[in-house]
Amino acid sequence: MERKDIRKRLARPAIKFAAGGFRPTQSDDESWLGKVFLFRPDETVPKNAAGIELHPYAQLYLPDLPFCSSALRGIRVLTVFISEPFPEPFEAMGDNWLIREYSFDEVLVRKDFASPDSPLKPFALKAELVEEDFPLWDGGGIPRDI
């Protein structure tokens, strides 16, 4: 198999995020690192088993991204929370980290839950399309016949 054929089979679109370096819009359709402000009316910041609030890690507004996986079709917003110390790699979601997903028909409200103890400084994210991204050779995602 020629190199160009391998590249064609492996290439996938992806998104590269840049944090900071521009003035945030403060609108609901902005993605953030270190800040979460969209919640269902009945939600608050999640807590771990010890009752300690998780830190806001990221909020991603999917409709404005230049690419979105078909696996996320119907999802408008993803929010991610993590504990400190940070969760272990491959740790099950729940106690030390949590992802919330919100569809287009869900009512979301802005809530300001300050997290003064968070090690993460909030930065708005700017998304850029990467037309061809490739899996790592040792990281999986490469068909056996290549």
Give the location of each predicted region.
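Preference for intrinsically disordered or flexible, low-complexity segments
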Residues: 1-146
